């Protein structure tokens, strides 16, 4: 809720949120960036606090907040840092958890990028997915408003988050979005939000059926084959590394590397795969090949 301009917000938000809580009986939440914010919110009886993306990116600021929270166990949500750094995100949870807080949750709001063609902040879904793998008990919420940056993207992003098994959503809503003092383009009216939520398909994490189990066995077989082929490729790469060492050749052969990326990208496209995906796969393979050849040359 944008109830006051930025200069007045620090003074009025406490009283406004208290009023909202009293009149509606709803839980209220707000962002904190300093120890002073924490003390004011605790004094006002705010139910939930969240740490913003720019604050998460600053370990010193997170530690200041953690120190201010010692002795209480209020729910704390932590947005991902602006840059795609999972370890930095996890580090923020560790700092807050070490202060004695146990009710923690994550907010995925996307990552800053120069590429603004579609999203305001790139989703990079693999990062929150890896967070879930690393900390499976941690609730993860999606912020489609900040990811999309445009209200027409809110609905599809909400559904995508639900399809990926996110635990909830944090959506910006305003009674008159075009008049909002900040982020107007990404806000929706309460009626539109209600419409979006009612259209959501919530899928279940069902138990494995016999047919699904068979398909997963096929995936396991494919993965085993991929590992074996990669191991064979790395053996050949090490032989090439030995040859380069004996003939005083540089490890990086740019022409050959570009040829591989171009040809494999084209092959992938013919097989129905995205060329950018294939490029990333072979970039990772090349990086490991270079690492292994470096070990050989430096022996």
Write out the residue ranges for each language-model feature.
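Single conserved hydrophobic/aromatic residue that forms the stacking wall/gate
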Residues: 1-13
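Active-site flanking residues adjacent to catalytic metal/cofactor-binding acidic residues
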Residues: 4, 30, 142
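Structural motif
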Residues: 29-33, 52, 79, 276
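Short, acidic/polar
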Residues: 33-39, 153-158
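Receiver (REC) domain switch/active-site residues of two-component response regulators
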Residues: 46-47, 167, 223
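Acidic, His- and aromatic-enriched active-site or binding-groove loops in soluble protein domains
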Residues: 48-58
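Catalytic alpha/beta core domains of metabolic enzymes, predominantly
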Residues: 57, 61-195, 199, 207-208
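Domain-level signature for soluble enzymes in the chorismate/prephenate branch of the shikimate pathway
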Residues: 195, 205-299
């Amino acid at each position: 809720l944008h109830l006051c301009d930025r200069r007045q917000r620090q003074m009025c938000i406490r009283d406004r949120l208290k009023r909202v809580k009293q009149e509606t009986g709803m839980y209220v939440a707000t962002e904190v960036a300093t120890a002073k914010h924490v003390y004011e919110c605790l004094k006002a009886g705010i139910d939930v606090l969240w740490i913003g993306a720019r604050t998460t990116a600053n370990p010193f600021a997170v530690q200041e907040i953690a120190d201010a929270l010692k002795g209480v166990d209020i729910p704390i949500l932590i947005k991902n840092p602006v840059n795609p750094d999972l370890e930095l995100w996890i580090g923020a949870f560790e700092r807050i958890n070490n202060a004695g807080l146990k009710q923690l949750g994550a907010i995925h709001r996307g990552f800053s990028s120069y590429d603004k063609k579609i999203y305001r902040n790139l989703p990079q879904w693999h990062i929150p997915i890896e967070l879930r793998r690393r900390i499976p008990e941690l609730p993860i919420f999606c912020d489609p408003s900040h990811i999309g940056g445009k209200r027409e993207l809110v609905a599809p992003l909400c559904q995508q988050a639900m399809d990926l098994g996110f635990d909830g959503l944090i959506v910006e809503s305003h009674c008159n979005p075009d008049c909002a003092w900040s982020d107007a383009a990404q806000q929706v009216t309460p009626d539109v939000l209600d419409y979006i939520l009612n259209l959501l398909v919530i899928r279940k994490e069902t138990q494995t059926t016999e047919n699904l189990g068979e398909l997963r066995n096929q995936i396991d077989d494919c993965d085993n084959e991929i590992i074996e082929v990669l191991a064979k490729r790395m053996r050949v790469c090490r032989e090439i590394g030995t040859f380069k060492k004996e003939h005083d050749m540089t490890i990086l052969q740019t022409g050959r590397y570009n040829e591989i990326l171009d040809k494999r990208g084209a092959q992938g496209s013919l097989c129905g795969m995205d060329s950018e995906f294939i490029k990333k796969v072979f970039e990772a393979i090349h990086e490991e090949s270079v690492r292994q050849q470096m070990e050989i040359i430096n022996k």
